[in-house]
Amino acid sequence: MNKQIDLPIADVQGSLDTRHIAIDRVGIKAIRHPVVVADKGGGSQHTVAQFNMYVNLPHNFKGTHMSRFVEILNSHEREISVESFEEILRSMVSRLESDSGHIEMAFPYFINKSAPVSGVKSLLDYEVTFIGEIKHGNQYSFTMKVIVPVTSLCPCSKKISDYGAHNQRSHVTISVRTNSFIWIEDIIRIAEEQASCELYGLLKRPDEKYVTERAYNNPKFVEDIVRDVAEVLNHDDRIDAYIVESENFESIHNHSAYALIERDKRIR
């Protein structure tokens, strides 16, 4: 019987690439993984996040080691927070032997809200994304992005109509870079308080009357919403930079109204 000879398996990814063109981002995209996220109430939420994970690739390497991205995710089963998110990113850059890295973690986040009159409780979901980036081996930046569904009511429609006004569901998207800790709930409240009215998962008839009249008494253009949110963010010392967007899904048109304000408060 011939004896089997174990030969080393070639590392194709680590071989030399002769084109000498560096790649800015390479990795895995849209991989789902269970996570645990801390909430402001002192508890935590078990949810499923979708990850995009990338590193840079020097010009002399043929490829990156894709399996290592999954191994890194599997090694972080514990609670994920703003602080541990940086740890995951740094371990990825180190493990892949790169100078820069980028991770996006998008997940649904739930808040148990009380209806404004009846007090009945129900969950409402929000879209949250953590975005972390390391450049030049050490420079770390973190962005939190939250999409908040709200109600907007048109001031012009109210002004020119004998009764009623068109209103619609809107998305207020706030992306912030901070210098100190800020809860997801804090960002959500900023958006909801500047809308014509906030949304609820469950409403009884007295609640429905309240939110209808609340929106009617608080009409806002898409421009009003982004300006009002920006004004709050300008006065929040925890926030260094932000992008605030508002998209109104117009009920009387087959298109949306949209506005955006971007500011880096560190630049005078």
From Swiss-Prot:
- Per the record, the domain of life is Bacteria
Annotated Gene3D superfamilies: Urate Oxidase
Disulfide bridge map? none
GO MF annotation: an example: GTP cyclohydrolase I activity
- InterPro entries (alphabetical): GTP_cyclohydrolase_FolE2, GTP_cyclohydrolase_FolE2/MptA
Q: Name one GO biological process term.
A: tetrahydrofolate biosynthetic process
Function text: Converts GTP to 7,8-dihydroneopterin triphosphate.
HAMAP family linked: GTP_cyclohydrol_B (MF_01527_B)
Q: Name the family the entry cites.
A: Belongs to the GTP cyclohydrolase IV family.
Give the protein's recorded name: GTP cyclohydrolase FolE2
Origin species, per record, is Nitrosomonas europaea (strain ATCC 19718 / CIP 103999 / KCTC 2705 / NBRC 14298)
